Regions:
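Juxta-kinase regulatory segment immediately upstream of eukaryotic protein kinase catalytic domains
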Residues: 1-3
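ATP-binding glycine-rich loop module of kinase domains
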Residues: 10-36
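The N-lobe alphaC helix and its flanking beta3-alphaC-beta4 segment of protein kinase-like domains
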Residues: 34-49
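Short beta-strand micro-motifs within the conserved protein kinase catalytic domain, predominantly
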Residues: 55-68
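Conserved kinase catalytic-core helix
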Residues: 81-116
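An alpha-helical support segment within catalytic cores of ATP-dependent transferases
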Residues: 107-154, 158-165
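Pre-DFG segment of protein kinase catalytic domains
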Residues: 170-171
Length: 171
């Protein structure tokens, strides 16, 4: 990583830096490399279906560290969360934009994205605190839900939405 970087956010197992014209997410050794590559693949797939988002540019192993980095394009702008905080009088307007973006995203399909149904099934199966009957009932409910290939952002919140300098919203 270059010395001229600005830390944007630090969460759990990652730190996000601004490199000027690019953004890099640096994951520590607790993040499986397969998850880092999967995030890059998901970015590519949502780009291909037309959702406004930064393009993945590179995945690389960190030098002198046990971790990985995902480099993406930088979308010039401000997060929706920052705008909501800075301009509380416009909170309702920003919230409406946020909801409209979620509706827009749900209008896209991407059959190659990992299916949330499969993820939830794995999660239900791993809940040792629940007895087998309860897990079975949850799986039955999950199986009864509509099967679609609509895009659903797994962590959709205003801090993950950028209001671009062009006025468009990006995820």
């Amino acid at each position: 990583l270059p010395d001229s970087k600005t830390e944007l956010v630090r969460r759990g197992n990652k730190v996000v830096y601004d490199l000027g014209d690019k953004i890099v997410k640096v994951f520590n050794e607790t993040k499986p490399v397969s998850d880092v590559f999967n995030e890059a693949l998901n970015l590519a797939r949502i780009n291909e279906c037309g959702i406004r988002s930064p393009k993945a540019l590179e995945v690389s192993q960190l030098e002198n560290a046990n971790g990985w980095a995902l480099v993406t394009e930088k979308v010039p702008g401000t997060t929706l969360a920052e705008k909501m905080t800075a301009e509380p009088q416009r909170f309702g307007e920003y919230l409406e934009m946020f909801v409209d973006l979620q509706i827009e995203i749900h209008g896209y399909t991407s059959p190659l994205l990992n299916r949330q149904r499969d993820k939830y099934a794995r999660m239900i199966d791993s809940l040792d605190q629940l007895n087998a009957t309860t897990r079975y009932n949850l799986q039955e409910r999950l199986d009864g839900m509509t099967k679609e290939f609509k895009v659903c952002h797994g962590d959709f919140n205003p801090s993950n939405v950028i209001v671009g300098d062009d006025g468009q919203l990006y995820v």
